[in-house]
Amino acid sequence: MSHNTFGHLFRVTTWGESHGPALGCVVDGCPPGLRFKLEDLQVWLDKRKPGQSRFVTQRREDDLVKVLSGVMLDADGETMTSTGTPISMLIENTDQRSKDYGEIARQYRPGHADFTYDLKYGIRDYRGGGRSSARETAARVAAGGIARLVVPGVTVRGALVQIGKHKIDRRNWDWDQVGQNPFFSPDAAIVPVWEEYLDGIRKAGSSIGAVVEVVAEGVPAGLGAPIYAKLDQDIASLLMSINAVKGVEIGNGFAAAETSGEDNADEMRMGNDGTPIFLSNNAGGILGGISTGQPVVARFAVKPTSSILTERQSIDADGKNVDVRTKGRHDPCVGIRAVPIGEAMVACAIADHYLRDRGQTGRLK
């Protein structure tokens, strides 16, 4: 299987499977001299790890990251400094239950990659989906922790803005609320609504989709390039690579189809300090594939988890019709834990474009 690497200068390769002994990543192209502690990476993995509420999978993984290479340890025994060589990181799997998947070893679960993997490779890891499992994204989040260190002054934050048909009230948006509830919601008022709604979904053994929004602030103007190296193009590509993501929009996104040119185009004026300012941000901080200096805004839609208790019609590897009922521990709404994953992907895209811009123009933005 190829295509396990993304990025041009900031390059990330992930490896490992859901029920293997471990998974991890190699970050190549990280500049030397970046100083950080293990906790600077672990904080993001803790945000993604399973078992933190009744609304996510009850698989228990500590997701403790180990840095194996690419750094030198300071005298304090905690602070690491990147050397410019590949940074390899490892996360052990400790709570696999492969026996839960024995009955589907030859059955194709509806909505999963079982059929397409078998069709393409002639073999698949049925234990939790193997490489196609969202478990792989733990390695991406670790890489995103490194990416956040690359571009000075950039803050990447994500939030859940919709579960099923229940959307947040954007007038209530408060970033301080995101870490105060199990949904990463910026709207405190929607939390009890989501709790009641997801409890019903969970008890029924079903699942539901969601929408995640990621905002990157402090992104320097000038990142990205036309025509085939657009910043929004690469952000969309990386977000689409996340398991269960079926749609991505930048800025106004699909709402632009309902908007007039007068309302959609972001007007400009000169600020009091003599620098240009935008009067709106419908473009999501990117014009012509190049960052404007405004916040970069991306949203992505996550489909309902395909692993549900409801019996579904399918076929098996022998070409027989079967009824499939998925066992194991699964997220009733995978969109919740997709928030830190989306953050990591956007951070990696921005870090890559920052290094590419620096290499092409020589500017330290």
UniProtKB/Swiss-Prot annotation:
One of its GO terms (biological process) is amino acid biosynthetic process. The lineage of its organism: Bacteria, Pseudomonadati, Pseudomonadota, Alphaproteobacteria, Hyphomicrobiales. Reduced FMN (FMNH(2)). This is Chorismate synthase. GO terms for cellular component: cytosol. It is an enzyme of class 4 (lyase). It comes from the Bacteria. It catalyses: 5-O-(1-carboxyvinyl)-3-phosphoshikimate = chorismate + phosphate.
